């Protein structure tokens, strides 16, 4: 019997039989006592005289099933976090923690932590054949123990200390050790929500997303972060008051650098400790669900940071990243790109996605920087990229990974949404994989967003020359399932807030902003608005401080907030505005050619749901500060057309120029319709009308 312990003065069996120290070493060895069987316990006396009795980790057999290792090697273990990482469990009748890590190019791997003085000599792990996976069961280790892995590369001999890629909780930055997290036993209260989620037809329901950075939405009085539970209550109250259907969180996956906003992830299986423990985040999601609000998480499989204690060069070789820097480095961001062609890396990422959807009941993932994954020459100079096997610039491995990701997540978690932030014209992003598409649920409409904000930034007197920027988007509006995003990226890095991107004096800026929102909420596509935009914050977003909530003391900002609430209500209540966001039959131009007056008008139509159609909604938008009196608009139905919303209402901070609540249609054919109404179009405003029985 041989024991190695560099910190022990003496080692003995529990019955008192001593193991003599081998001279000049830290080995203790001797014959086994008669009748001793595993698992046995050893009494170790340290150099300061303290004694500790525990089971010998090396008396236990392997704890990882061969089948898990087989699936992992084939790239088909979509729940790899269930066997890799640190897992408290009972093994051979003894409680403890099973550690496992993938490091195929290491000649030695050890578990180090606060339980062994961070000494890699104490708990070396065993390798499981050719899988590259190392494991060790440490009996008696308590929950909450801090740990990392110490690895020695077989070729260079370099010794590295790395945090656990599969850690489910980490220390608060700047510390980076993983924490032994017990199995989740949170008592969820969202059974009804989860059951409905599986049955939801997301294509035809209203989806209005409030994008939030938890660290800067609100803060405590001393400027510190609020915790998940406090944020849950405050955010839900605000979202219910403003009418959004979903909250989208900028990444809360663990990350070391606050300034990355979470987009440089090091912990793909752990909610950041900045705001609390994993159960606190479960409470956050649970509280949202119990109040009818979905939760979407920004998730970053495109790249990861170079921090030397995390994924980069994990076992002394480029393991998670591609070895060729022309494929493995992102020049602009200074980060590393995942090797999507490696089975174990694909397992890692797919398991992460499923983990958030299953373990934390997340309703959807917004996949960041998809364009950078699809193109081998993305943001690269000539000669700084390697073509694929066909000589093209498409990243075939990334395409295959994204298709597999969407196929698996949609199959295992029906009703969840996987959205792509994809800024190019790559075809079929949201078409099924069996048709050759990438399989995403939805895609951000970056083209519409860019054209719209460019147009809105023009002085109204010049807008007639840029009218095509309003109408061009309809040429491709139904080629994908689009989300219309005014996101965090549009209110930072010198771009200014949405309010200050609008031209004119104070009144015109607010009127333009209200007009912009009316356009967004009546145009085909699901909606997304970044925090602060809902009340017209004037300053650019600052991730290091809370939003400027004090501006809600001023009437014009109050008016914007009321408008967003009413737009959300209108979007939810009028089926024509949401049932066919992705179907060309749900939209028709009334007039898209009124360039001289910089006005557009269109119908949103409900083609019928369960065999019964609901009334259409007509939107008229005046992009000039000139009121338009006696403006005749063609409509498809007779009767009374009620003014459902007017952004120039004094309720929102406008001049209250409008149509007295509604107008009667006349039997005057106009614009291809058999009836028409005569309207007053307020300046820099949008009006929404729909037919009904009468005033």
Swiss-Prot record:
SMART domains with a match to the protein in the record: Aamy
Biochemical pathway: Glycan biosynthesis; glycogen biosynthesis
InterPro entries registered for this protein in UniProt: A-amylase/branching_C (IPR006048), Branching_enzy (IPR037439), GlgB (IPR006407), GlgB_N_E_set_prok (IPR044143), Glyco_hydro_13_cat_dom (IPR006047), Glyco_hydro_13_N (IPR004193), Glyco_hydro_b (IPR013780), Glycoside_hydrolase_SF (IPR017853)
Gene3D superfamilies: Glycosidases (3.20.20.80), Golgi alpha-mannosidase II (2.60.40.1180), Immunoglobulins (2.60.40.10)
Reactions catalysed according to its record: Transfers a segment of a (1->4)-alpha-D-glucan chain to a primary hydroxy group in a similar glucan chain
E.C. no: 2.4.1.18
Transferase found in the keyword field: yes
Keyword Signal (UniProt): no
MF GO annotations: 1,4-alpha-glucan branching enzyme activity; cation binding; hydrolase activity, hydrolyzing O-glycosyl compounds
A biological process term (GO) from this entry: glycogen biosynthetic process
Record's keyword terms, sorted: Carbohydrate metabolism, Glycogen biosynthesis, Glycogen metabolism, Glycosyltransferase, Transferase
Enzyme class, broadest EC rank: transferase
Cellular compartments per GO CC: cytosol
HAMAP family: GlgB
Known partners and oligomeric status: Monomer.
Function: Catalyzes the formation of the alpha-1,6-glucosidic linkages in glycogen by scission of a 1,4-alpha-linked oligosaccharide from growing alpha-1,4-glucan chains and the subsequent attachment of the oligosaccharide to the alpha-1,6 position.
UniProt similarity note: Belongs to the glycosyl hydrolase 13 family. GlgB subfamily.
Protein name: 1,4-alpha-glucan branching enzyme GlgB
Source organism of the structure: Alkalilimnicola ehrlichii (strain ATCC BAA-1101 / DSM 17681 / MLHE-1)
């Amino acid at each position: 019997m041989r024991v190695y312990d560099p910190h022990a003065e003496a080692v003995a069996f529990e019955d008192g039989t001593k193991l003599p120290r081998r001279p000049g070493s830290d080995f203790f060895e001797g014959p086994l006592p008669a009748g001793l069987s595993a698992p046995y316990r050893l009494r170790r006396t340290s150099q300061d005289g303290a004694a500790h009795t525990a089971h010998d980790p090396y008396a236990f057999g392997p704890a990882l099933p061969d089948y898990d290792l087989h699936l992992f090697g084939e790239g088909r273990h979509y729940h790899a976090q269930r066997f890799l990482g640190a897992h408290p469990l009972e093994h051979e009748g003894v409680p403890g923690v099973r550690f496992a890590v993938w490091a195929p190019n290491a000649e030695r791997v050890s578990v180090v932590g606060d339980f062994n003085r961070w000494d890699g000599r104490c708990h070396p792990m065993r390798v499981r054949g050719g899988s590259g996976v190392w494991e060790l069961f440490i009996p008696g280790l308590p929950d909450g123990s801090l740990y990392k892995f110490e690895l020695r590369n077989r070729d260079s001999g370099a010794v590295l200390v790395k945090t656990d890629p599969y850690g489910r909780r980490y220390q608060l930055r700047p510390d980076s050790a993983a924490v032994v997290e017990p199995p989740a036993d949170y008592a969820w209260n969202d059974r009804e929500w989860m059951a409905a989620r599986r049955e939801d037809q997301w294509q035809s329901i209203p989806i209005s997303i409030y994008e939030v950075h938890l660290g800067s939405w609100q803060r405590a009085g001393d400027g510190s972060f609020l915790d998940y539970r406090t944020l849950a209550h405050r955010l839900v109250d605000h979202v219910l008051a403003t009418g959004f259907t979903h909250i989208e969180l900028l990444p809360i996956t663990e990350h070391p650098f606050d300034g990355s906003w979470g987009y440089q992830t090091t912990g793909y299986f752990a909610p950041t400790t900045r705001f609390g423990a994993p159960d606190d985040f479960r409470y956050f999601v649970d509280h949202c669900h119990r109040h009818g609000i979905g939760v979407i998480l920004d998730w970053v499989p495109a790249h990861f940071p170079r921090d030397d204690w995390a994924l980069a060069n994990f076992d002394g070789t480029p393991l998670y990243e591609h070895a060729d820097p022309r494929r493995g480095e992102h020049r602009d961001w200074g980060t590393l790109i995942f090797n999507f062609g490696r089975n174990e890396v694909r397992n890692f990422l797919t398991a992460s996605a499923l983990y958030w959807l299953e373990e934390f009941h997340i309703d959807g993932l917004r996949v960041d920087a998809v364009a950078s994954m699809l193109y081998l020459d993305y943001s690269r100079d000539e000669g700084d990229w390697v073509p694929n096997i066909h000589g093209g610039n498409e990243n075939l491995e990334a395409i295959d990974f994204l298709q597999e990701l969407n196929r698996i997540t949609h199959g295992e978690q029906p009703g969840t949404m996987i959205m792509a932030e994809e800024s190019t014209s790559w075809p079929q992003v949201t078409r099924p994989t069996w048709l050759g598409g990438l399989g995403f649920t939805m895609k951000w409409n970056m083209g519409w967003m860019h054209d719209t904000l460019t147009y809105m930034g023009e002085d109204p007197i010049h807008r007639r020359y840029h009218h095509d920027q309003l109408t061009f988007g309809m040429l491709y509006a139904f080629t994908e399932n689009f989300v219309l995003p005014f996101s965090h990226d549009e209110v930072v890095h010198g771009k200014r807030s949405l309010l200050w991107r609008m031209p004119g004096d104070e009144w015109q800026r607010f009127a333009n902003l209200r007009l912009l929102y009316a356009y967004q909420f009546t145009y085909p596509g699901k909606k997304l608005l970044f925090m602060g935009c809902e009340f017209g914050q004037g300053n650019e977003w600052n991730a290091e401080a809370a939003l400027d909530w004090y501006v809600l003391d001023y009437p014009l900002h109050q008016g914007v907030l009321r408008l967003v609430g009413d737009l959300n209500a209108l979007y939810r209540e009028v089926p024509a505005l949401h049932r066919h966001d992705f179907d060309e039959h749900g939209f028709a131009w009334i007039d898209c050619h009124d360039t001289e007056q910089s006005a557009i008008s269109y119908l949103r139509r409900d083609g019928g749901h369960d065999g019964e159609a609901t009334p259409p909604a007509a939107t008229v938008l005046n992009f000039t500060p000139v009121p338009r009196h006696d403006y005749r608009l063609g409509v498809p139905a007779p009767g009374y057309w009620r003014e459902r919303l007017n952004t120039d209402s004094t309720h929102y901070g406008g001049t209250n120029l409008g149509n007295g609540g509604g107008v009667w249609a006349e039997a005057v054919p106009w614009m291809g319709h058999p009836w028409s109404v005569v309207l007053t179009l307020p300046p820099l405003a949008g009006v929404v009308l729909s037919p009904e029985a009468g005033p």
